[in-house]
Amino acid sequence: MLNLIPAPRGSVHMQEGSVKLPETVTVSLGDFAPWCLEAFAARLDGHVETAENGFITLKKVDIAKEGYKLTVTKDGITVEAADESGVVWALTTVTELTAEGEALPIVTIEDAPHYGHRGLSLDCSRHFFTADEVKKVIDQMTRVKLNVLHWHLVDDQGWRIECKTLPLLHETTGTYYTQEEIGS
């Protein structure tokens, strides 16, 4: 039994055996944008490169929005998805599977979200978090496949966005995010 959060809504077919991720994981992007590898690469300490014949092959197919089919064999990994979000969720599952041990089980997982909107509300107007803390929250959201962040920045208790034309808005509440921090 696999301990995945959230549990896949589709099918999970386990087989005997396992495969280890190479030291540097190569990924064939296919028709997908490179940004969909960012969180995966960060979790593997940057040991991810794109290649024509990668250990992981991404294929664009007609399946549910944000859904994916992940196939792990001794020869490598295939991710089938309709969009970049599906790729992100599949690669999140790969990192979750490797967290259970050094090797990935030989498995095929079909998964798609039940709800299109899966989110978290972060009220930084009433309780300020640093930009680094917000980034950690976003990373944790990705790990459990949440796709919407409601970042509450303005209320009676505070104006948390730097406003260069009206600086008193943010200066009177003390702590705020610079425009550079918001952009990163």
Task: State each model region's role.
Residues I63-S184:
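Feature activates predominantly on carbohydrate-active enzymes
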